[in-house]
A protein has these predicted regions:
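Positively charged n-region of N-terminal signal peptides that target proteins for export
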Residues: 1-5
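Bacterial N-terminal signal peptides
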Residues: 6-18
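OB-fold and OB-like single-stranded nucleic-acid-recognition modules
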Residues: 21-149
């Protein structure tokens, strides 16, 4: 009987978990810009329009692995815009166009980076180290989904 209770508890937890994971309502870019430390290293859902897509040259991570197909763009919603980095594929030489184009409406699942404490971020010039005083706020793309027009 105890084993059945444990099994049912695990099953209910497994069934409920995806609903919590999918329940992330989109937030505005301005919410992130207003409180970047609150969102640092958290996953968020944003919706907006793609602007200024910039493919990046291959770059090398500090560990020596080269990454290909990375690009940057701005995601603009009705409140503000935020820099978005798509890291591409590391260790696999490839030539690939960005997954988005200027003017496209998308839903973005991303991890926010606001590394004012130091760290790395991807820029138009490649991988950069953040100084203690820099206020870089960036969304790192986890999943990009086109929105219907």
């Amino acid at each position: 009987m105890k084993l059945v209770s444990i099994f049912i508890g695990l099953l209910l937890g497994w069934v409920a978990l995806p609903s919590f994971a999918l329940a992330a309502d989109p937030i505005t870019v301005q919410e992130i810009l207003d409180e970047p430390s609150r969102f640092h290293l958290r996953q968020v859902t944003l919706q907006g329009t793609v602007r200024n897509v910039q493919p990046l040259d291959p770059y090398t991570l500090p560990a020596g692995t080269t990454c290909y197909g990375a690009y940057l763009f701005y995601l603009e919603d009705e409140t503000a815009s935020i820099n978005v980095a798509a890291f591409g594929l590391c260790g696999i030489p490839t030539v690939k166009d960005p997954d988005v184009e200027d003017g496209a409406r998308i839903e973005l699942h991303a991890t926010i980076q606001a590394p004012s404490h130091g760290g790395y971020y991807l820029s138009f010039q490649g991988l950069k180290v953040v100084g203690e005083r820099e206020g870089v706020i960036q969304a790192v793309a986890d999943r990009i989904t086109p929105l219907p027009e």
